[in-house]
């Protein structure tokens, strides 16, 4: 009997314990007002410590005990708190929540919520470029250069340097496909339009280092662009003194498309330079992006681009004054029968296929092709004199003495044809708190290159250089090379999020491997980053990233200049060239706070990059000339600071400050700074509006950057170097908005179909500062050399009109 009593009591105890331990789950999605998922939203059951956080898809799960009147609190930086009360909770349930921005809209000005950044990848709002005063014609890169760690010393170019790296060390993706630049570009005047069309852009992400393994083999940075998939009809058209653009987006059931056209002519801007010339630059491109979704599980995309850049230049004369106030030097040139005609044409196409195998697994296939035909033709003949004086450069005037008189001629017939094709596969799988990503790609490259260029100078009738026994050209360069090669690459990575008593951790680790058939080199690149949001202060985010980043050579790096028996410089290809390597160490964090009821964020990052197997290079304007051999090592270290927030209520602005030191040792003997190491860089992006009348907007972009090291042409750093003066520039734009539905003129006739009309005026280089980008070198009969500065653009007024519909 006692045995039965004990058994019954044990069963009753177990049943009671099971009932007491019963739990229920609340799951759901948290989205913003636009329907986009919100990551890192904190969900807490009121008056308890029980909580959870949303993942990158905005999904959350929270476990609790059954009860009546359960209250959930949803909080996220930049959004109003939301509270949801469940009157009776006795079973699992789904609860979706929408959160609203904390900022108040002021007319058409609205503050973007400050998102948490647990990796080194930073999000950029693409719509900020719309009213940004930009001499390059409106590019995403013009906004990127205002970020900490990024610098640019040429307003005519969309190229940029990140933490002392080369322009070629930055990788750009559009919809997951790598895009390429022309290779022969030697000046900002020739460069034309950036590949990325801001009108078509939906989102922009940028990392200045320590990026994930899924991004390719570059040493400095990654710019990741995603184009729009419109849900309804939209479009805009703009025109200015620099050119114009237009785009149209639409959605037709299962098909959506966005197509854009751009035209740029910087003739008026180039007219502010020292050279009096007939400038005729014509840059055009058309891009289209189509999406087809036959089912909820299948998506197909096509991206196409055609770009044609033509640059025609007929110089007449040039007059440049330089030096100190007490000692002015004048350089005057006449150009008889000189001209330059360049043409760059690129074609790009990419097709992607995505298949959602399940709720947690997505697979993809992609194929792309890039074709570029580049042609550079010029014959520039000049008669010059270099003189000292304070009035003008006329040699017949008193007080003027000729320091050097002579003639020169520059000749080039350069052609390059490059073709790059690749096919690849990608995949992602979400398993519990892990997001596993993988991919593999094979890339075929075919490049043919023909170079024929030379330069001849004479002073007082003597050809230079003077050797005493022979007369030769000051420089010449010839090549006729072809290369066909194949690259293989693959990666796998895992993003793992977990919570402890200390806070939320985000760990991303992966490895990337590549092989290039041309130099028969394997490279392996492990990368890892860790983000942490502490429980004691969720306004604080800390992160650490490290990894080994290789940069496999492309065609430009392979060029090795040697001399033949006749003394001519000949370009050969170095198939023993190996990948450059950079080991990154980055530690940093963000702190978000409110000041005067406005949102602010302070970001700081310390970094150190150990560089070896470097291929040294020199820069002339934007043309990069590599040594063609792995003969250097070095380092880059610095501090990047960025202060972001509502400097003016209802607007986003920021100030970026970068301090750095970057050096290289060439052939174990020559120490020199890296070519793109300014030492310091201060950038400002500022937005404002007219007090009491918010339809008048002001956008300001300012840059103060240290000078870059310059070497004597064809000599390299072994012959010494000096730095250009600091780069200083402020561009200002003022715009007036006619808004649909609120302006009387917009309710009449044709205007009622428009959303907005913007009328604006830009003042480029408002302080009219003469910035030096490169130097023209004058050699006297005694082989003494003078460096004459090539100044960039002066002050220029630009008028703009933007129509949105």
Model segments located where?
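Membrane-embedded beta-barrel scaffold of Gram-negative outer-membrane proteins
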Residues: 364-368, 576-630, 635, 759-762
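Face-selective signature of the C-terminal outer-membrane beta-barrel domain
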Residues: 293-308, 339-519, 603-606, 654
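Short, acidic, small-residue-rich periplasmic hinge/interaction motif at the N-terminus
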Residues: 29-34, 41-46, 71, 75-80, ...
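C-terminal beta-signal and adjacent terminal beta-strands/loops
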Residues: 653, 704-711, 736-805
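Gram-negative outer-membrane beta-barrel transporters
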Residues: 497-503, 607-610, 627-712, 802
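Surface-exposed extracellular loop regions of Gram-negative outer-membrane beta-barrel proteins
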Residues: 535-585, 606-626, 701-715, 770-774
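Periplasmic N-terminal accessory/gating domains of Gram-negative outer-membrane beta-barrel systems
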Residues: 80, 93, 116-170, 176-211, ...
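Transmembrane beta-barrel wall of Gram-negative outer-membrane proteins
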Residues: 236, 240-263, 276-316, 340-369
């Amino acid at each position: 009997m006692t045995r039965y009593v004990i058994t019954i009591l044990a069963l009753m105890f177990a049943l009671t314990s099971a009932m007491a331990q019963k739990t229920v789950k609340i799951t759901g999605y948290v989205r913003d007002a636009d329907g986009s998922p919100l990551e890192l939203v904190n969900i807490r059951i009121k008056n308890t410590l029980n909580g959870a956080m949303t993942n990158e898809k905005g999904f959350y799960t929270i476990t609790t005990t059954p009860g009546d009147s359960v209250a959930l609190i949803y909080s996220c930086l930049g959004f109003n708190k939301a509270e949801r009360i469940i009157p009776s909770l006795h079973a699992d349930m789904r609860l979706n929540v929408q959160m609203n921005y904390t900022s108040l809209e002021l007319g058409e000005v609205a503050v973007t919520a400050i998102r948490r950044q647990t990796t080194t990848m930073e999000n950029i709002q693409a719509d900020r470029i719309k009213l940004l005063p930009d001499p390059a014609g409106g590019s995403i890169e013009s906004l990127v250069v205002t970020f900490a760690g990024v610098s640019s010393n040429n307003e005519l170019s969309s190229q940029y340097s990140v933490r002392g790296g080369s322009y070629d060390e930055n990788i750009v993706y559009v919809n997951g496909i790598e895009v390429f630049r022309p290779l022969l570009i030697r000046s900002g005047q020739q460069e034309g339009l950036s590949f990325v069309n801001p009108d078509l852009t939906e989102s922009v992400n940028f990392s200045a280092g320590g990026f994930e393994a899924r991004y390719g083999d570059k040493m400095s940075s990654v710019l990741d662009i995603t184009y729009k998939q419109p849900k309804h009809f939209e479009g805009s058209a703009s025109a200015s003194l620099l050119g114009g653009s237009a785009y149209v987006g639409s959605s037709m059931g299962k098909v959506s498309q966005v197509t854009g056209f751009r035209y740029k002519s910087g003739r008026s801007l180039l007219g502010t330079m020292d050279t009096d010339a007939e400038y005729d630059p014509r840059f055009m491109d058309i891009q289209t992006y189509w999406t087809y979704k036959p089912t909820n599980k299948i998506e197909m995309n096509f991206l196409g681009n055609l770009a044609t850049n033509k640059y025609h230049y007929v110089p007449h004369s040039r007059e440049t004054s330089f030096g100190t106030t007490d000692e002015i030097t004048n350089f005057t040139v006449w150009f008889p029968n000189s001209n330059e005609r360049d043409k760059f044409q690129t074609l790009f196409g990419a097709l992607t296929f995505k298949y959602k195998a399940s709720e947690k697994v997505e697979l993809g296939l992609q194929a792309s092709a890039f074709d570029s035909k580049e042609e550079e033709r010029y014959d520039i003949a000049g008669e010059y004199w270099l003189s000292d004086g304070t009035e003008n450069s006329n040699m017949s005037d008193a007080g003027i003495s000729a320091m050097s008189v002579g003639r020169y001629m520059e000749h080039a017939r350069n052609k390059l044809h490059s073709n790059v094709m690749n096919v690849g596969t990608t995949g992602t799988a979400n398993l519990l708190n892990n997001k596993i990503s993988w991919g593999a790609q094979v890339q075929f490259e075919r490049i043919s290159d023909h170079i024929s260029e030379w330069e001849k100078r004479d002073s007082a009738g003597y050809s230079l250089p003077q050797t005493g026994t022979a007369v030769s050209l000051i420089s010449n360069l010839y090549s006729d090379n072809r290369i066909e090669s194949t690259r293989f690459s693959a990666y796998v990575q895992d993003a793992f999020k977990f919570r402890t008593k200390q806070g939320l951790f985000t760990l991303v680790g992966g490895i990337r491997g590549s092989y290039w058939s041309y130099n028969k080199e394997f490279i392996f690149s492990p990368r890892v980053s860790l983000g942490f949001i502490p429980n004691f202060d969720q306004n604080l985010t800390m992160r650490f990233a490290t990894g080994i980043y290789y940069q496999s050579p492309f065609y430009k790096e392979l060029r090795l200049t040697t001399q033949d028996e006749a003394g001519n410089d000949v370009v050969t290809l170095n198939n023993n060239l190996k990948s450059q390597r950079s080991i990154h160490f980055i530690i940093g964090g963000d702190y978000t706070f409110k000041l005067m009821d406005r949102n602010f964020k302070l970001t700081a990052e310390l970094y150190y990059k150990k560089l070896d197997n470097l291929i040294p290079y020199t820069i002339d304007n934007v043309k990069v000339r590599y040594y063609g051999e792995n003969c250097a090592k070095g380092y880059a270290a610095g501090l990047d600071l960025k202060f972001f927030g509502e400097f003016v209520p209802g607007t986003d602005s920021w100030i970026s400050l970068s301090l750095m030191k970057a050096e290289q040792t060439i052939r174990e003997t020559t120490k020199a700074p890296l070519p793109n190491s300014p030492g310091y860089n201060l950038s400002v992006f500022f937005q404002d509006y007219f007090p009491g009348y918010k339809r008048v907007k002001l956008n300001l972009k300012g840059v103060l950057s240290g000078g870059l090291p310059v070497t004597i042409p064809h000599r390299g750093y072994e012959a010494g170097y000096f730095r250009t003066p600091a780069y200083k520039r402020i561009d200002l734009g003022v715009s007036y908005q006619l808004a649909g539905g609120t302006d009387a003129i917009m309710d009449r006739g044709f205007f009622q179909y428009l959303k907005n009309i913007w009328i604006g005026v830009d003042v480029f280089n408002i302080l009219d500062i003469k910035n030096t980008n490169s130097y023209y070198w004058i050699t006297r009969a005694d082989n003494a050399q003078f460096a004459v500065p090539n100044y960039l653009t002066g002050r220029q007024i630009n008028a703009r009109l933007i129509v949105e519909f």
